[in-house]
């Protein structure tokens, strides 16, 4: 392994997660060396030592592949001044640094080299807050250096040093040595095998409780992403055996001990033992219990329903079908009911009627909500009644996980009626959180299209509620929205029936552009986007929807190409490059993490209207926000988004890339969901074979959940 010393001349690239960087190092021989590393980029001007080896990149030539980086302690007074200034401490500028150097003289080099930050507290003339921050920063630099050496000695990338220090502080190395698997809790991108190898180096054997515990936690953490609330015990043992390659009896005994301690929960159903993480068990069991309590009550409102329906029809120049009338009557009569149907079946018109009817019936405290901001806005426009997102309604607890809300059973919502739209997006944890906050006196109406993609997260609540046959529901089948020749709706229903849509027909609403290569696809997408952009007033009314995020045909790369084509650099446009991504005034962006302080949530799309020295200013549907540039990891470019991210939204124009390289993502419900996002126009850019594959592929991924069975009373809690 080679070691090179020098200073960072320029940072070229750093990814969003700050786990990969490219920078130019100027060594002590005045040679400029391109370095790459899987760690947070060092700051420009810092003296560092990188360790690694030279490699030959097929495109960029000779580079230094660094496995670790260490900030060097200064060896002269000029370097000491630069070192202290580069610490980036607020209120600790050039004058303050001069005070430190004047007070310590040459001794500052020894203090920094031997990591004795406690002596900093003796300096006169500096504010206590600055001295405390300087002490903590220098202490942290020493610990980071120790962590870097620790990781390097075990042949592990030092990219995780900073996140470990943030969590464990001065005890970082001691914590890891005691239990290296704690790394998996604080370093989300670390593989289990990395921590496992470190544990082996530290003498932890294969059946050690710490290893079994970490393996189990690793498996259970993946359940939510896979849609499961639980796993059959045999599958859980099998997965752990595959991961740990240890004695199966040890695994079984360990699971049994956790069940006895209450650290895991279980349920028997049809002679199979299902194992739950605690939060999933509570969400499933309590979510069902809240539902049952409402189902046991029937509380019809004081309203002449037939007369109300007739008057609503006259006032709005419409005629309800039998199923629509049934849905309205059921919602007024039952405390808990469902309405499901595809596009154009009148779900939103029914919601509008329900709002009016409940108001006339004396139940005026009505809430309309949906999982996403765009869905809530659409609901507001269609019903002329203010709707909100579920997250805003429940008021998230800042600093906690995504399902911890201030509104709950102890502090319920002050409502008479709640109508939840786009309910196909409800996973079991969000459903539980919502039901816990609904008072027992309220009417609950759940509305959604059960044929869309299942939710992100565990369970498929809407489907389970319908399939249980325990919940009063209405299924809408008759199409009303522009029923005369609406090819978007016709194509969506054809896809849902497993039939090919007409890809050869000439239609303003639904069209197909065949392509034979990736380059052709990208050119067609850009050409169509530019053309359709001229027909809309709102940039948010056109959307590219891709089956997946990563890869050459993924939404991330498509967004980059479209940005260059429709919003190129210009001297009058502000722009900023953060973590390797360029953001420019006029760009569409999507929020990818909940920001409770700014009240902007995952999935919301906006447009950048200004960029300042410190902030990216974004106009979202419901508000304008100033996002600090150092928090830009919370957004991504959004010219293209995934189908999952598009759920709950509608756009005037939808462009759908659909090519064979999407592989296993070519599924019927995915294509159906993408097509039904469009109000006026759908353009599919791809191949006939990809569409054919999706139409005939029914997503058969099994989700392990006993929500339906609990509702039916067929399994014990």
Show which residues each predicted segment covers.
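Structural detector for short beta-strands of small beta-barrel domains
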Residues: 1-15, 52, 608
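Short aromatic-glycine-enriched beta-strand elements
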Residues: 13-25, 613-617
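Accessory alpha-helical DNA-binding modules that contact the DNA backbone or grooves
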Residues: 20-28, 35, 43-51, 58-273, ...
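Pre-P-loop entry segment of helicase/translocase ATPase cores
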Residues: 152, 213, 221-222, 266-326
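Conserved helicase motor core of SF1/SF2 NTP-dependent helicases
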Residues: 333, 353, 357, 361-364, ...
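Conserved lysine of the Walker
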Residues: 347
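Conserved helicase motor core of P-loop NTPases
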Residues: 450-598
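C-terminal accessory regions
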Residues: 604-717
């Amino acid at each position: 392994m080679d070691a090179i010393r020098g200073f960072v001349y320029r940072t070229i690239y750093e990814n969003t997660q700050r786990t990969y960087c490219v920078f130019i190092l100027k060594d002590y021989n005045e040679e400029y060396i391109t370095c790459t590393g899987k760690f947070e980029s060092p700051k420009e001007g810092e003296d560092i030592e990188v360790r690694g080896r030279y490699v030959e990149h097929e495109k960029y030539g000779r580079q230094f592949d660094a496995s670790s980086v260490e900030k060097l302690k200064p060896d002269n007074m000029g370097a000491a001044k630069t070192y202290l200034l580069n610490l980036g401490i607020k209120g600790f500028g050039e004058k303050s640094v001069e005070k430190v150097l004047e007070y310590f003289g040459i001794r500052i080099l020894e203090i920094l080299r031997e990591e004795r930050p406690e002596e900093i507290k003796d300096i006169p003339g500096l504010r206590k807050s600055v001295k405390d921050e300087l002490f903590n920063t220098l202490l942290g630099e020493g610990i980071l250096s120790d962590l870097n050496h620790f990781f390097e000695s075990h042949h592990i990338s030092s990219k995780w040093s900073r996140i470990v220090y943030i969590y464990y502080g001065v005890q970082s190395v001691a914590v890891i040595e005691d239990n290296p698997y704690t790394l998996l809790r604080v370093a989300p991108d670390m593989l289990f095998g990395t921590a496992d190898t470190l544990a082996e180096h530290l003498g932890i054997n294969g059946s050690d409780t710490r290893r079994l515990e970490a393996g189990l936690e690793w498996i259970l953490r993946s359940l939510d992403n896979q849609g499961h609330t639980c796993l059959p015990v045999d599958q859980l043992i099998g997965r752990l055996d595959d991961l740990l390659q240890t004695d199966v009896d040890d695994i079984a005994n360990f699971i049994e001990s956790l069940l006895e301690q209450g650290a895991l929960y279980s349920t028997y159903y049809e002679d199979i033992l299902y194992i739950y993480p605690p939060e999933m068990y509570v969400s499933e069991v309590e979510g069902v219990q809240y539902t049952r309590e409402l189902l046991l009550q029937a509380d019809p409102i004081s309203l002449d329903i037939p007369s109300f329906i007739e008057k609503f029809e006259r006032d709005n120049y419409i005629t309800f079908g039998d199923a629509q009338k049934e849905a309205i009557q059921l919602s007024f009569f039952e405390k808990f009911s469902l309405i499901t149907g595809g596009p154009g079946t009148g779900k939103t018109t029914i919601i509008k009627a329900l709002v009016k009817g409940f108001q006339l019936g004396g139940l005026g405290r009505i809430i309309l909500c949906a999982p996403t901001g765009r869905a809530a806005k659409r609901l507001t426009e269609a019903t002329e009644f203010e709707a909100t997102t579920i997250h805003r309604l429940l008021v998230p607890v800042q600093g906690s996980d995504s399902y911890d809300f201030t509104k709950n059973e102890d502090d319920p919502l002050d409502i008479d009626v709640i109508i939840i739209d786009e309910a196909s997006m409800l996973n079991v944890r969000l459903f539980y959180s919502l039901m816990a906050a609904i008072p027992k006196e309220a009417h609950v109406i759940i509305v959604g299209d059960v044929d869309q993609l299942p939710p992100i997260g565990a369970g498929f609540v809407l489907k389970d509620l319908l399939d249980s046959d325990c919940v009063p529901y209405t299924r809408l089948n008759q199409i009303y929205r522009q029923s005369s020749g609406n090819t978007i709706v016709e194509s969506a229903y054809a896809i849902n029936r497993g039939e090919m849509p007409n890809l050869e027909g000439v239609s303003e609403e639904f069209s197909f552009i065949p392509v034979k290569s990736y380059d052709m696809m990208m050119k067609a997408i850009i050409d169509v986007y530019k053309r359709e952009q001229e027909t809309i007033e709102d940039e948010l009314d056109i959307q590219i929807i891709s089956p997946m995020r990563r890869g050459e045909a993924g939404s991330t790369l498509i967004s980059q190409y479209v940005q260059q084509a429709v919003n190129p650099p210009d001297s009058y446009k502000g722009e900023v490059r953060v973590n390797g991504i360029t953001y420019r005034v006029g760009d569409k962006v999507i929020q990818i993490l909940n920001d409770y302080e700014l009240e902007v949530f995952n999935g919301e799309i906006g447009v950048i209207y200004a960029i300042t020295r410190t902030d990216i200013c974004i106009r979202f549907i419901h508000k304008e926000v100033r996002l600090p540039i150092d928090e830009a990891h919370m957004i991504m470019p959004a010219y293209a988004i995934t189908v999952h991210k598009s759920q709950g939204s509608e756009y005037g124009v939808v462009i759908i890339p659909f090519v064979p390289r999407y592989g296993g993502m070519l599924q019927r419900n995915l294509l159906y969901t993408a097509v039904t996002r469009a109000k006026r126009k759908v353009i599919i850019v791809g191949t006939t074979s990809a569409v054919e594959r999706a139409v005939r592929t029914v997503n058969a991924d099994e989700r392990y959940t006993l929500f339906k069975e609990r509702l039916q009373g067929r399994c014990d809690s």
